UniProtKB/Swiss-Prot annotation:
The active site is at 39 (proton donor), 94 (proton acceptor). This is NADP-dependent malic enzyme. Its EC number is 1.1.1.40. Pfam families: malic, Malic_M, PTA_PTB. One of its GO terms (biological process) is malate metabolic process. Residues 1-428 are annotated as: Malic enzyme. It comes from the Bacteria. Signal peptide: none annotated. It catalyses: (S)-malate + NADP(+) = pyruvate + CO2 + NADPH; oxaloacetate + H(+) = pyruvate + CO2. Keywords: Metal-binding, Multifunctional enzyme, NADP, Oxidoreductase. A divalent metal cation binds at residues 136-137, 162. Its cofactor is Mg(2+); Mn(2+). NADP(+) binds at residues 195-198, 288, 320.
Length: 756
């Protein structure tokens, strides 16, 4: 490690707050009543319920989503026996991964105890605190004994990740590598270098998957493990000892081996050894930080090899983060009393099968836009694949239920999988009613920028989710080439439709229609012909106007204003509507809030704002949410007559006249809009109850500044902008829109088209 990187790592852990984790309350502690409920005397009630029924601890405490990461520091990463305290940064890091990838809370516990029996007693005594235990960085062979004793004594999952996490990912890599080379697990011969916790766990799992014990040869630092050897032989090694056939070194055992499993040391596997392996060798060189052999070294002598390492700078990274958060997620969610072999095997196949699917846009973005398809350089999923949680956790949970170790079985699997998506896509719960409605009657949705990578990834997801029938505008050759490059499973004419703007059979109909709509706006036939061929938003709007689609989504490049001008010219405003406007939603940890007008009107009149407010309230209803509207200003309830305050008071009167049942009040400052207690101090009889969920701003500057601040200073996720007031469902995103935002907008556009 360079000195610069070393210092960066130290700074990362020290600033702005030492360490990587903290405890955050999940309940409000703002009032005396809150304290009385959270602690004395209110806390006595859940205590008494748990005393009557210990299972109630999962109902009234955080235990069901809390895992202990426990280590004695005897085998820390590649650092060895550095002690419990020195290993604490690693354990905190493990906790961060649990939280990031699976939403699981963690207490890291470093125990300064080397005696296995005492360590077992200490850990077992902590069972009332946790829903599961992740053992970490405990050296072999003690780790085998400790885990086994804890599994016998505890009624919660105990999982030594160094053993089983590595084993599960390695097994998935081997399963898929065998698929690629056309070999069967019961026929192949494996040579292992290393006989520590990870290696033995890998071998045990492979046996349960069908590998034959007689086809396995194990080597350690003393050479081949064979019957009759006395040096450094413990019980776990003896189980894999072969008959003495004269082999003494790794070099003796490796010729004609199909698989090399390395959990040993850098350089242990030489190029000469690789040369001697069977056809299409499978090499797992998992030593860290440097593998037994690097992929370039192995490929130089055996181009037909499939090589996996533990490093992120090579293909096929065997990384435990691919499984441990999701195995615990599934185990916790069904109240599993253990993690058994059935659950591990379920995880293996869930991981292996995911690699067979098309690439996800989140993964592609995380790896610099680089796509991958199943093959020698992509045998297991990548760690940032958001589908891991929705594949592994349900598979593990089902296996727990089927094998009889689940105490809280899942009844509704669709709802469970949807709940899991919230750990990846924060808009999932918010968009649930929209997705359900979109699926009920699929609409034809045009994506104006169909050649964009994000549009193609969104199309793949939309089709997989059954949300709509996409129509992509773009050059057919470009779209098909990008689909291939991105590793997507899309077929034009089967999964989606292409409208090739350079070879459009409806070209004449489109340009003539566009000309008729715009001939009094300076558009000549010659201009119309050129624009319809070159401007994809114009073409999309024209197709929508002609009835060849039900809705459109555009804006992945170009300015909002130019897209809006095209849509307004061709689609036009809805009957009775005088102005278009934009509505954005922000999904915040404290709830969802809508803001308007965020894109269109720079300084709308009171009449225009009233119309915008009523349109926004109608849009909010589509999400199954009852609008609670705050008209914002710098003043509160008539305290000022300057700037936009009088205008907002006029808006209130107009809206009340047109919709007396809408919950609305104003004008008011933003803090009053979001805090009912403060609002009541100034206006006790305000009809607005709770926090406002629709914020109406006096002008574009105020709305854009507020929107940007909320997005930039919170963890808010945006949905929108939703274009309101148009004659058909047409919406404009922005160039920074994520694939998920495109998917959300396609679904919303579809629902709006259904209802209009």
């Amino acid at each position: 490690m360079t000195e610069q990187l070393r210092q960066a790592a130290l700074d990362f852990h020290e600033f702005p707050i030492p360490g990587k984790i903290e405890v955050t309350p999940t309940k409000s502690l703002a009032t005396q009543r809150d304290l009385a409920l959270a602690y004395s005397p209110g806390v006595a009630e859940p205590c008494l319920e748990i005393e009557k029924d210990p299972a109630a601890s999962y109902k009234y405490t955080a235990r069901g989503n809390l895992v202990a990461v426990i280590s004695n520091g005897t085998a820390v990463l590649g650092l060895g026996n550095i002690g419990a305290l020195a290993g604490k940064p690693v354990m905190e890091g493990k906790g961060v991964l649990f939280k990031k990838f699976a939403g699981i809370n963690v207490f890291d516990i470093e125990v300064n105890e080397h005696d296995p029996d005492k360590l077992v007693d200490i850990i077992a005594s902590l069972e009332p605190t946790f829903g599961g235990v992740n053992l970490e960085d405990i050296k072999a062979p003690e780790c085998f004994y400790i885990e086994q004793k804890l599994r016998e004594r505890m009624n919660i999952p105990v999982f030594h990740d160094d053993q089983h996490g590595t084993a599960i990912i390695s097994a998935a890599a081997i399963i898929n590598s065998l698929r690629i080379v056309g070999k069967k697990i019961e026929d192949v011969r494996l040579v292992a270098s290393g006989a520590g916790a990870a290696s033995i766990a890998c071998l045990n799992l492979l046996l349960s998957l069908g590998m034959k014990r007689e086809n396995i040869t194990v080597c350690d630092s003393k050479g081949v493990v064979y019957k009759g050897r006395d040096d450094k032989m413990d019980q776990t090694k003896k189980e894999y000892a072969i008959e003495d056939n004269g082999w003494r070194k790794l070099a003796d055992a490796i010729p004609n081996a199909d698989i090399f499993l390395g959990c040993s040391a850098a350089g242990a596997l030489t190029q000469d050894m690789v040369k001697s392996m069977a056809a299409h060798p499978i090499i797992l060189a998992l030593a860290n930080p440097n593998p037994e052999i690097t992929p370039p070294e192995a490929k130089a002598v055996r181009p037909d090899a499939i090589v996996c390492t533990g490093r992120s700078d090579y293909p096929n990274q065997v990384n435990n983060v691919l499984c441990f958060p999701f195995i615990f997620r599934g185990a916790l969610d069904v109240g599993a009393t253990t993690i058994n072999e059935e659950m591990k095997r379920a995880a293996v196949y869930a991981i292996a099968d995911l690699a067979l699917e098309e690439q996800n846009e989140v993964v592609t973005s995380a790896y610099g836009g680089e796509g991958a398809t199943f093959g020698a350089d992509y045998v297991i999923p990548r760690p940032f694949d958001p589908r891991l949680i929705v594949r592994i956790a349900p598979a593990v949970a089902k296996a727990a239920m089927e094998s009889g170790v689940a105490t809280r079985p899942i009844q509704n699997w669709d709802a469970y999988v949807e709940k899991l998506t919230q750990f990846v896509y924060k808009t999932s719960l918010f968009m649930r009613p929209i997705f359900s409605q979109a699926k009920s009657a699929k609409q034809r949705i045009i994506l104006a920028e169909g050649e964009e990578n994000k549009a193609l990834h969104a199309t793949q997801e939309v089709i997989s989710m059954g949300l709509a029938n996409p129509i992509l505008i773009g050059r057919r050759s470009v779209i098909e080439e990008k689909i291939k490059k991105l590793g997507l499973r899309l077929t034009a004419g089967v999964d989606f439709e292409i409208v090739d703007n350079e070879d459009n059979p409806r070209y004449e109909e489109c340009w003539k229609h566009y000309y008729e709509l715009t001939k009094r706006k300076g558009i000549t036939p010659a201009i119309a012909k050129r624009v319809v061929r070159s401007n994809t938003t114009v073409l999309a709007s024209t197709l929508l106007s002609l009835g060849y689609a039900d809705a459109l989504v555009c804006g992945l490049f170009g300015s909002y204003g130019k897209h809006l001008a095209s849509i307004r010219d061709i689609i036009g405003l809805k009957d009775g509507v005088k102005t278009a406007a934009a509505l954005n939603s922000l999904v915040l940890p404290t709830g969802n809030v809508f803001l308007t007008d965020t894109h269109v009107n720079s300084n709308p009149t009171a009449e225009e704002l009233a119309e915008i407010t009523l349109m926004a309230a109608e849009e909010i209803h589509r999400f199954g949410i009852e609008p609670a509207v705050a008209l914002l200003s710098h003043s509160n309830f008539g305290s000022s007559d300057s700037l936009g305050a009088p205008k907002m008071r006029e808006v209130l009167q107009i809206v009340k006249e047109r919709n007396p049942h809408l919950m609305i009040d104003g004008e008011m400052r933003g803090d009053l809009a979001m805090n009912e207690a403060h609002r009541k101090e100034l206006m006790p009889d305000s009809p607005l109850k709770g926090s406002a969920n629709l914020l109406v701003f006096p002008d574009l500057s105020a709305s854009r500044i507020s929107y940007s601040l909320l997005r930039g200073t919170t963890t808010a996720i945006t949905v929108g902008p939703i274009l309101m007031g148009m004659n058909k469902s047409a919406h404009i995103l922005n160039p920074g829109a994520s694939v998920r935002r495109i998917i959300n907008m396609i679904a919303y556009a579809a629902v709006k088209a259904q209802q209009e």
